[in-house]
Amino acid sequence: MICEREINVVEKKLYHKQDIRLNYYEIKNDLQPLVLIHAQGVDAVSFGNVWERLSKRYHIYSVDCYGHGESLHDAARYNIVDISKAVGSFIEDVVKEKVYLLGHSSGGLIAAYIASATELCSCLILEDPPFFSSQGERRKGTFNYIDLSTICHRFINQSESRDFVLYYFSNQYAWNFFPEKSREKVKQKLTGMAAEYRKKHPDKNLKVMFWPKYALSGFQGMNNYDPLFGEAFYNDSFHSAVLHEDILKNIKCRTVFMKAQTNVSEEGILLAALSEEDLGKTAGLIADCKIVRFECGHGIHIEKPKEFVECLLSL
């Protein structure tokens, strides 16, 4: 069913129960509930560009994970079990019915855990989650590990900089994609521009002239990101020793896997969430899994919003 009436406003709310604290955004209507779980580093507003269009078909709930946005910041809780329990409790107490559950990247790992451990999910949508590639020794050969995870690890073990947003921008792996001859000059200039913007607008999302818009989307909400969350992926404590295989084989609901492009660097670094082999293994373990491919990078809802929305409206 597609709702053709005027779209309701986005409401920002807080779910607080005992030691659970989740900030979330809601677009109310009487349609199928859709809970959105964002990737690490950004916040729930990462999905803001598709909220309105999705609300024609769904009652939208977009949640800040622990360590992000205005949800609980407690490093001891930055793991798949605690976050999944919190979101599960939110669904039980706030939504109060079975949901369509969508998770992007690390949010996809969380969504999958909820679907495997509870009866709260009637349809699971996985937006390019890093199954198998982000766990154990495999994680060390991925873009996320050499980029965000390692930068978080270095940031919390230094004392010169307090601005993680600027620290990440100046140390990100993306500089390696610039021509070696001009790399340092360009890096110095753009980092200077970023520093100036941070000085003038410390509470705003980072903007840097000439930096690609889709790349800047990765800084959405980074002001409130706790680098200790990235440390949990650096040392693999995020998974709480729960194997991806055990999560996937217990998912019984209908599942859609949104797969972005797969790229590998000359050095063998996986410049993607997961490999084609990982994808095959993932889909093979889920009882009912449909794969939908997108010709874009990891942020499908950012780079291909029209196709992303069309996929969800067709479910």
Where are these regions (language model features)?
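Hydrophobic, aromatic-rich cap/lid helix
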Residues: 185-246, 262
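Flexible "cap/lid" loop of the alpha/beta hydrolase fold
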Residues: 125-183
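Catalytic histidine-centered segment of alpha/beta-hydrolase-like enzymes
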Residues: 293-305
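Conserved HGGG/HGGXW glycine-rich cap/lid loop of the alpha/beta-hydrolase fold
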Residues: 20, 26-73
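Short glycine-enriched nucleophile-adjacent loop
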Residues: 108-119, 124
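Active-site loop/oxyanion-hole signature of alpha/beta-hydrolase fold enzymes
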Residues: 65-102, 106, 113, 137-138, ...
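Conserved loop-alpha-helix segment in the C-terminal half of the alpha/beta-hydrolase fold
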Residues: 247-295
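Post-His helix in hydrolase/transferase enzymes
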Residues: 302-314
